[in-house]
């Protein structure tokens, strides 16, 4: 059945208390640990190599890493080690909710104390980007970014203005999106809204609380996120003027690298399925990538070429073609948060 969602886990572990599961909605999975739960004991060195395609653990209980330089897949498991390139890298501290910079040269994650850290891919150069205040839980950072537009000046200083880490902050059970400059600076709330003019004129304002699971994509600072009370997925775009669009029922969204498509989780007949659709306003058709699911597929991530979606299952990590042309195949027995290095 549905796994638990993660946005309250990091602080709960850091404070060594027990947190209850928080349901996203009846339309999506419950918030689960997904690599944000710290494991005890020594780091495990994963075996390099391929994967099992049965959707079940490898025969004999053998651990299958499933990551490689070719497939760009990485897996953070809530321990000190992160699986990548067919092996594991020891970061010297607990790594939860790892995300990559747009150029693949840095990672950002939540450490065992609940703070935001950045580091090089080999775990070196760790730096504290921001410290979580007491009583707040931070989770699921994503690296927002924008490229210089073709006009060169449509949005002044867009590369610096949108070079941010966006994450979820949970204070007293109230969820909000917050952001901090990737180069360091003050933490401030990111409040998705609609401007009073332009295409969003007259549109209702989206919820300001209950927002979680931000995911950045594309070259114009787009952010997908979920709203827990509504059980809805949204896309926020303030590149030219603020505009927030309701994509529909679901949770745990991820934008494709070009921001042209979105994948999200929705519960169907007792299991969590993966759905995709275009982000274009006039293309609302959805496709179930897992129509015959007999297990839960959660926490999806796009490959750099946009052709593959990886997702967590109770048995590890599976991948599925983004066009739905084949059934999911298990590639790793490691249980954690899948994310692709650009």
Name each model feature, range by range.
Residues 2-342:
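Sequence signature of WD/YWTD-type beta-propeller architectures
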């Amino acid at each position: 059945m549905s796994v638990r969602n993660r946005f309250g886990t990091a602080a709960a572990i850091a404070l060594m208390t027990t947190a209850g599961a928080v349901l996203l909605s009846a339309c999506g999975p419950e918030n689960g640990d997904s690599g944000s739960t710290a494991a005890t004991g020594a780091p495990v060195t994963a075996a390099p190599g391929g994967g099992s395609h049965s959707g079940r653990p490898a025969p004999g209980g053998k651990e299958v890493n499933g990551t490689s330089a070719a497939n760009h897949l990485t897996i953070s498991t809530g321990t000190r080690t992160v699986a990548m390139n067919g092996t594991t890298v020891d970061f010297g501290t607990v790594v939860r909710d790892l995300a990559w910079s747009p150029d693949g040269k840095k990672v950002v994650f939540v450490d065992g104390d609940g703070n935001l850290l950045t580091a090089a891919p080999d775990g070196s150069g760790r730096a504290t980007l921001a410290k979580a205040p007491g009583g707040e839980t931070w989770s699921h950072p994503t690296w927002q970014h924008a490229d210089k537009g073709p006009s060169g000046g449509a949005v002044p200083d867009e590369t610096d203005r949108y070079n941010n880490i966006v994450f979820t902050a949970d204070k007293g059970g109230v969820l909000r999106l917050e952001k901090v400059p990737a180069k360091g600076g003050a933490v401030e709330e990111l409040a998705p809204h609609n401007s009073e003019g332009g295409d969003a004129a007259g549109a209702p304002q989206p919820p300001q609380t209950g927002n979680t699971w931000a995911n950045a994509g594309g070259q114009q600072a787009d952010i997908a996120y979920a709203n827990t009370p509504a059980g809805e997925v949204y896309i926020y775009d303030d590149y030219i003027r603020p505009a927030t669009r309701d994509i529909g029922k679901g949770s745990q969204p991820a934008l494709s690298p070009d921001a042209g498509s979105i994948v999200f989780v929705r519960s169907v007949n007792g299991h969590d399925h993966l759905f995709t659709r275009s982000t274009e306003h006039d293309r609302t058709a959805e496709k179930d990538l897992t129509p015959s699911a007999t297990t839960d597929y959660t926490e999806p991530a796009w490959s750099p070429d946009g052709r593959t979606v990886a997702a967590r299952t109770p048995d590890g990590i599976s991948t599925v073609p983004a066009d739905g042309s084949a059934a999911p195949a298990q590639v790793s027995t490691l249980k954690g948060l899948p994310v692709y290095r650009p």
